[in-house]
Amino acid sequence: MKIFLLIGQLFGYLSLIVPRKVEYPLYLIRRAYITTRKRGLFKTFGNGSLLAPGVKLRTPAHVSIGKNSSIMSHCIIETCPTDKCTPHLKIGDNISLGEYSHITCADKVIIGNGVLTGRFVLITDNGHGKSTERDADIAPLARKIHSNGPVNIGDNVWIGDKATILPNVTIGKGCIIAANAVVTKDIPEYSVVAGVPAKIIKSLK
């Protein structure tokens, strides 16, 4: 374990001192190393998929990633097993999850093929407690994680920077979710949505 930490630190130090023209090849080497080291932690991990430096994983044994998908730097991928649910987080083929994005799953989150997200996107099917009067008297961190309904994102959806996909939502294929939108209900196929809460502003078909 120590040798892996030392190698990771070495790559980090080299990125600070090497010329810029060498920086990107060094990044590619580091990304390949991280992917090789961590791919076995997942339930399934497709050929050609990559994990960038800084990705944080929490109980990835419940996570399936398809082929040729990229999880960019500093993303958080987590599942939250509970006494009532075994999480099922499925990320499809040809996905690009933007930097600093966060996917958290207590029950079921399905992301279809060809989905692209910007940075700082949140996709969640859960929350701390059930938002009841009883829970209001308990510190949020002390409340049990509770799934509020599955999230299902169809193929070829484009999600802009800082958008939030809340629990119990289905987004149809081919949709565009504008930056900063908060999706609280189902979105039909080929819709463009924006706002808080997100509303349909255009249909693509």
Annotate each language-model stretch with its function.
Residues 170:
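Nucleotide-sugar donor-binding/catalytic module of glycosyltransferases
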Residues 129-139:
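Short, flexible, mixed-charge acidic loops at enzyme active sites
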Residues 1-125, 150-155, 165, 173, ...:
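Domain-scale signature associated with acetyltransferase and cell-envelope carbohydrate enzymes
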Residues 139-151:
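A short acidic, glycine-rich active-site loop
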Residues 161, 166-167:
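Conserved beta-strand->loop/alpha-helix structural units within folded catalytic cores of enzymes
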